[in-house]
């Protein structure tokens, strides 16, 4: 990441970070909080190694990352991952049809295991078939640029992609019409008058 990009992130996120120094301790600055979080998200380092690198306690690192990921999502979500509108979905479907001959396809969905340290008192709930502890990121992306259109994360690694999708908000959003999905339409080169859902 360039210095300019980092400074731009600081400018965007700093107003939402509310920390004060006290008589007993100096708070972790907004700049350092952002650095800790970026290092964690970019490398997957353990809290212990981040604590050593930044000379902070493991619990402090854990708390900073938990707070900062929420702030990053709340501040940047609307600009960098807005909910697609009907026309955006139709553009994605047109690219799927043109590139892959898949008409009315709005995305490719899959789960990705994100390696984590074993959580305290979690037993084997995050232990996956690849023989490590993980949480699962369920995501849908467009046809060619591999840009996420919908994401959800936090499911225990032992769950299958199908099980996660069945229990996910993504599935509920689709079923309840909250994703601005276009109305059914005819398939290209189809002689019937049937309309098929996206």
Question: Language-model segments: which ranges?
Answer:
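Structural motif
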Residues: 25-31, 127
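Short alpha-helical segments in extracytoplasmic peptidoglycan/chitin-binding modules
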Residues: 2, 36, 50
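A structural signal for short hydrophobic/aromatic patches embedded in well-ordered alpha helices
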Residues: 8-9, 36, 92
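Short, well-ordered secondary-structure "scaffold" segments embedded in the functional core
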Residues: 46-198
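Basic, low-complexity segments
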Residues: 1-27
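Surface-exposed beta-strand-to-loop junctions
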Residues: 14-17, 42-51
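Short, amphipathic alpha-helical "recognition" segments used to contact nucleic acids or chromatin
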Residues: 30-43
């Amino acid at each position: 990441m360039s210095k300019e990009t980092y400074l731009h992130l600081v400018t965007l996120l700093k107003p939402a970070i509310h920390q004060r120094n006290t008589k007993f301790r100096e708070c972790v600055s907004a700049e350092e909080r952002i650095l800790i979080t970026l290092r964690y998200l970019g490398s997957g380092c353990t809290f212990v190694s981040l604590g050593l690198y930044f000379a902070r306690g493991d619990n402090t690192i854990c708390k900073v990352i938990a707070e900062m990921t929420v702030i990053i999502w709340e501040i940047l979500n609307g600009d960098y991952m807005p909910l697609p509108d009907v026309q955006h979905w139709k553009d994605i479907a047109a690219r799927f049809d043109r590139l892959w001959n898949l008409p009315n396809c709005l995305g490719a969905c899959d789960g990705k295991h994100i390696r984590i340290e074993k959580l305290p008192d979690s037993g084997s709930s995050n232990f996956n078939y690849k023989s490590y502890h993980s949480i699962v990121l369920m995501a849908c992306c467009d046809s060619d640029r591999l840009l996420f259109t919908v994401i959800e994360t936090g499911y225990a690694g032992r769950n299958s992609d199908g099980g996660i999708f069945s229990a996910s908000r993504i599935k509920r959003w689709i079923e309840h019409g909250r994703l601005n999905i276009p109305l059914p339409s005819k398939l290209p080169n189809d002689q019937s008058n049937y309309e098929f859902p996206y």
